């Protein structure tokens, strides 16, 4: 399971670098990867900030006790807006395709975060590191990416097919 998560799912981000350069890619293949990393990490931080500022209602208390509905919804909205406004600068997405990505990617990031939290709890790893205060370790930085990378890749293929 760990091999699939780390190699297969995260491999989608690396595969984006093989996208041929085109005038339809505003920032090139590297821009596609940068945008994925930007919105995934922004979503994590936005959920954390909204949760700390407004969080009252736990969303998954047994798996991730610090996650709240307020953090989830605030992060989802903030990240969706970031995708909507910054997406055209980095991707060939527009209109309906961009809207789908703006709605779906923050949801996938949250799902990846909660799923990896559940896996860590199952194997008895409570905290992976204290390297980034308030954010845990490397696994905590990449957990959302395990779900956002394949989704982003396939949504790009679906909505921008023939556009890059």
State each model region's role.
Residues 1-47, 51-61, 68-164:
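Hydrophobic alpha-helical transmembrane segments
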């Amino acid at each position: 399971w760990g091999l699939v998560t780390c190699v297969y799912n995260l491999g989608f981000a690396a595969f984006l670098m093989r996208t041929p350069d085109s005038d339809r890619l505003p920032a090139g293949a590297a821009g596609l990867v940068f945008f994925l990393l930007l919105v995934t990490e922004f979503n994590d931080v936005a959920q954390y900030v909204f949760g700390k500022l407004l969080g009252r209602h736990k969303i998954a208390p047994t798996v991730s006790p610090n996650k709240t509905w307020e953090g989830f919804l605030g992060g989802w909205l903030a990240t969706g807006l970031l995708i909507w406004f910054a997406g055209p600068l980095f991707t060939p997405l527009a209109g309906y395709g961009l809207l789908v990505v703006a709605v779906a990617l923050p949801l996938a990031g949250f799902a990846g975060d909660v799923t990896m939290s559940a896996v860590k709890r199952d194997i008895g790893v409570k905290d992976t590191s204290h390297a980034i205060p308030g954010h845990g370790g490397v696994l905590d930085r990449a957990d959302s990416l395990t779900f956002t990378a394949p989704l982003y890749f396939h949504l790009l293929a679906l909505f921008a097919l023939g556009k890059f």
